[in-house]
Amino acid sequence: GKSSLCNRLLASDRMIVSDVPGTTRESVERDLDYESKGEGTWGFRLVDTAGMRRKRKVDSTLEYFSNLRTKGAIESSDAVFLVIDAQDGVTKQDQILAESILDEGRALAILVNKWDQAQDTFRGGALEGYANLKEFRDSYEESIRKELFFLPDSPVVFVSAQTGFAIERILRTARQLDAIQETPLPTGELNRVIGGLLERQPPTLIRGKRFKVYYTVQVGTRPFRIRLFCNQPHRFEKGYKRYMEKGFQSHFGLPGCPVRFLLTGKEERYSRED
């Protein structure tokens, strides 16, 4: 589906399209100047990557190096789109890929391809329990978010490479993700938000002590990097970290954009000052 979507955007057949998963073995780059109605020309570089499989599933040297190139393409991208087949839903491999993209700190959106087929199935009466197509789509999106619960509220875009349905939304979403990643986060507001999250749901008591944050400041973008000056970094539990990330992203409006909390404990802070 990836190559078909790229070809639709490029209005060409430059990329090999096949029904056999894994046909693309190289990351193929193409520049695109898109004339948007009333908004001038948008410039993009599209990268159609090779699909990735887990190491123990890789069965050839070519595929191994294809995986490495895909990883490199992800690292250098401003926005990554994970393509899901509407007929299959979220697979285990999709979950693994989504986690890999998040680990690289890339902004991520979900593309549900072949949505025209899902719509036809609904209109044909094969699906029950939905009042209309919108309710069906909302339910489908909710199921995706449950399967990919660890993602930072990534946009979900329903498209069809075959018919061209909602294709421009891919480019609009890419522009939005790119712009969001340059958002400056005022230090005063950062500290109020982090303080509010800590107060709303205090960290767990561990041996009579809680994780505390004394001061917060933004130190980078792509991904957002937030320095937390705290008491003891080891008390920042994984579940609480996810809660803080979700609250942070929700307040500042950072859909699809990961956040990295960089923790500096009291002892480390004082040693730096010395």
Residue positions per predicted region:
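C-terminal-of-GTPase-core extension/linker across diverse P-loop GTPases
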Residues: 1-47, 51-68, 72-83, 88-274
